Each structure stands twice: as structure tokens, then as C-alpha cells.
């Protein structure tokens, strides 16, 4: 699971799903299913009405589910032959759904209307590109940045992060900002909140910045045990196990899933999906680029997207809906939610994205990160691979085994998954 999509299951009380349709009588009825929360429901109610106004004769039913319920229900619907006409997709899951024949090939539509993809960030399309064309298109994209608590930095007399920071600078600051504030012998303020299991948010960026790679899908190799990668892992292990400046998930459990949002870490690495969650914070905060490593600066890029069911009875109408969903009007509306970067380059340079209510930060920073972004690996069996690697990493962060042993275990387990999915 990509971390930014975890937002739809954190603190969101959706009773299974929310379903509505915008009009009554129509010649064609389309169904669309999405993952999301209350704000997504509100914006898609408006967009549904807008779509029907510009597409007379089509009635649109949209259903929004929380993250876990969405995938559970989608599996049942697809297996039962009652899949929605259009449904949301996470790039990491895309190859598995395409391999099972659940997705309609979009290339014929794109070939007939090539201008539809003009102005879309090319890198946002990469995850959905297959040897025989597209079976899905991106809705939005995510890059990773460094968030920091200005109040904690001020209290400790530590200078704010800058775009010249290296990982060594971050580590030094994190050590100074890790404190036992009440003197009871237990750390209650950490330097950095970082997701230590899933690759998207933190450790992939560190590995890439050390010159390492993650996976070679073509040859079925997990590459996180290379010499360059081990230097990165030793750096991370130093912060977690030696400095104790990055809390483990067990240490954070009492504070919730996000230590930065909870106000117990001075810094946090996350994507734009966290901005709306941080807006109500009682502390002052800012954002900076990811620090540089020996091989430069790096961030992952991932996306959510849209697909059309291979069993739809209305492929042309479904394509019209997909075009609408990735078009300028919908992209402007979705940009104002503040959860992601729009795929339309022009929108990212407009007030619709750059000026977001209650979030006066440098939103352009997330777009600028595309210049040094690495595509999060997308391949069949990704979720199984990530789980296998994550299990091994958990053993390291809990102190059960040394990091070198955990990575050796992760590589072997990852390679087995890759072999089983070739």
C-alpha cells in the first residue's frame, strides 16, 4: 500500500461506502468507484453534476469507499462480473489487475485522440505504460519532502533545514532534537518521523541518493543488498538503533500513525497527501526538499490513476468519463483538495494548486522534486514483494537481527516473489 493512500483509512469514518447519482433519467448509466474520504465525496458530487451537464444522456453513479473496503469490494465485483465501468487504481497494484484481464486497453482511444495526453507530466505516465499500450492513466502524482516543526527547532536552537542539507546534516539535527523532556529516562521527542517498512516514503529515497537501485524486474533481482545500498541501510540503522532519533512503529503506537502530526517528532518525511492533515496543527511547520546523499538528491514518485473495466458495456462513454477526470476542470477541483500534485503541468503552475487555503507553504517544491524523482517500482506481485521485504526490515528495526542479516533475508525473499511472478 502506498502511504499517501493510507490517509483514506486514517481517521476517516465511512460506513463502508457512499453512493450517489446526479440525475434520474438517462440513456446510459455509468458507474465509477473510488477510494477516498469525506472531502473526496464532496468534490466528486460536484464533478458528477458537471460531467452530466457536458455529457447529456449519461447518468453517472459514483461510489467512494475507504482504502481497505475499496479493494475488498472491487475484488468481489470483478470476480462476480459486475465491475464498475470506471474505477480508481494505485500504480503499485496496476500490473496485477492488468495481468488478470480486468482492465480495458486504452491505447485505441489514445491513438484516436493523442492530444488528450498533451500537457500531462511524462513521468506520471510511466507507471501505466506497458509493451502494448496503456490500460490505465494517472489521476495525480506524489513526491516526498521533508517537513519540520519550527517550534521544536527554535526551542533547541537548531537552524531550519535548507536545500543544501545532506543526510549527515539531517542526522546531526535529529540527534540534537531527540530529547527526554521530562527526565524520566525515556525519549518523548524524536528527531525524525519516517516510515521504516514501506519503501515509498523514506528508505527508497535514501538508497537512491546513495547510488543504489531497488529492483531489476526484468532479471528478477532484488537489489537492496548492493554495496551502495548497504551504506544507505547502515546510515538508517545508525539513526534508528544507535542515535534512537527515529522512533519505531511500536514506540509511536500510543501517538498514532504519524509522529510528526502528533507533535512528537521534530521532522517527518511524507508526501503532499499529509498537507491537509498538518494544517490544523497547533505548532508552526515548514517544508524543505529531501536531503542530498553521496549520489545526489532523490525522491520516489507514485500515483493514483483511473482504469476502465474490460467488461464494461459502455466503453466509449467510460472513456469520456476518464478524459473528464484527468482533464483541466477536474484536475483543478482535485488540486484544491491538497492531497496530491495534479498530472496537468499547467495546473501545477496555477493558483488552483499553488494557492491552497490554510496551507501557505511552497507547494512548488513538490513539483520541483520531479527533476530528481525515481519512479516507484511497478511490477506484478509488488504487494507480495513489499510484504516480504517489510517483514525482514521489521526484524532489523526491532533489534531482532543485525541490519545486514535482515537485508540478506529481504533479498532472498524478494527474489522468490519475483521468480513466482515472472
Question: What positions do the PLM features span?
Answer:
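Short, well-ordered beta-strand elements
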Residues: 27-37, 58-63, 85-86, 135, ...
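Extracytoplasmic/periplasmic solute-binding protein
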Residues: 131-139, 144, 169-221, 265
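Short, solvent-exposed loop/beta-turn-alpha elements that line the ligand-binding surface or hinge
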Residues: 107-120, 163, 182-192, 212-231, ...
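Extracytoplasmic "Venus flytrap"/periplasmic binding protein-like
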Residues: 46-120, 154-157, 257-259, 263-267, ...
